[in-house]
Amino acid sequence: MKAVIFIMDGLGDRPNKDGNTPLKEAKTPIMDKMAKDGICGLMNAVDVGVRPGSDTAHLAILGYDPYTTYTGRGPFEACGVGVTVKPGDIAFRCNFSSVDENFIVTDRRAGRIENTSELEKELDGLKIDDVEIIFKESGGYRAALVLRGPGLSDRISDADPKKEGKRVKEIHPLDDSKEAKKTAEIVNRLLKIAYEKLDKHPVNEERRKQNLPVANMIVPRGVGQVPEIMPFTEKTGLKGACIAGTGLIKGIAKMVGLDVIDVEGCDGTPNSDLMAKACAIVETLKNYDFILVNVKGADEAGHDGNYELKKEIIERIDEMLDYITKNISKDEVYFVISGDHSTPIEEMDHSADPLPIVIWGKSVRVDDVEKFDEFSTHKGGLNWIKGTNIMPILMDLMSIAKKYGA
């Protein structure tokens, strides 16, 4: 038996005034059929009442305790864009953002700029004192920053003010160590250099002419050091792969030893080629025991507060599942469908609302659930689980779980 965990990023939502969510209102005949033929429930990726990041959620879903393995988003983001992070490196995730001359943020995502490769070149390879700057864009407005040099620390604050209309935060050390003080100073200097180099860059001058938000600042957050994680194959005995469009998820996969399968046209945006991803899933199953799949678009729509787009993306994902289920055997593959977190339209950010989950495959205890949405799957046989329960359940179904006790 093989297994797929299929994650619709930001899937869950809260009811609008009509009692609907994008998932409830979307036409999803395949998801509904899989719910009817599978075992369903609700799932909190990290824990009840905890608003998870995509990083901590995916770690949990892969069977890792995020409270002991997670050091910050930065190392995963950097790893995902191809940086070979070394011991002692300090890594951050970054947004390209729009700021005014006083560093007041006017657009946290720089108008969702699509291509920042030319801007990347302005910062990658810089040196500030004895610290090397490694800077890589990771798709759209996202990027990864790595500081490499002696005497650095991840005990520093973030620069992200979280909301527009506020100033980019000055970085502060979180302890009295000289390493933390040095690192904070280096990052603060880098932010000033970034503004000077990016504000008048031709890419941004052209965006001004088109009345588009400029990408004239980088905002680092999610600082961390490289964690020590047991490889997925060693932990489960499964040869695993990952199909995802975003650098963060690719980085998590690489960090735990999953092979990352790149699919042309799949970049983690709402415009990703989902059918190309569906074809890749079917093909990859021929050579792997396990695949982690992440489809990002619904999360982007949730962050933008775009109800109709989120519903449309969910319907497009259902078309993916139509192709996949027609080209795999229920007797050979266990297929898990869920999300990593909710991104409600009203919040435009992650929430702790639980997610619907279904496991479809041979010999599951089919329950009475007939629709896959936030309001129906709680009646299912899985009841209410955490993300860290998924892999043990799958391994038991696949008959590879070890017995606990005599």
UniProtKB/Swiss-Prot annotation:
The keyword Isomerase applies. Pathway: Carbohydrate degradation; glycolysis; pyruvate from D-glyceraldehyde 3-phosphate: step 3/5. GO terms for molecular function: metal ion binding; phosphoglycerate mutase activity. Pfam families: Metalloenzyme, PhosphMutase. Keywords: Glycolysis, Isomerase. It comes from the Archaea. One of its GO terms (biological process) is glycolytic process. The keyword Zinc-finger does not apply. SUPFAM superfamilies: Alkaline phosphatase-like. It catalyses: (2R)-2-phosphoglycerate = (2R)-3-phosphoglycerate. InterPro entries: Alkaline_phosphatase_core_sf, ApgAM_prokaryotes, Metalloenzyme, Pglycerate_mutase_ApgM. It is an enzyme of class 5 (isomerase). Its EC number is 5.4.2.12. Belongs to the BPG-independent phosphoglycerate mutase family. A-PGAM subfamily. Catalyzes the interconversion of 2-phosphoglycerate and 3-phosphoglycerate. This is 2,3-bisphosphoglycerate-independent phosphoglycerate mutase. The lineage of its organism: Archaea, Methanobacteriati, Methanobacteriota, Methanomada group, Methanococci.
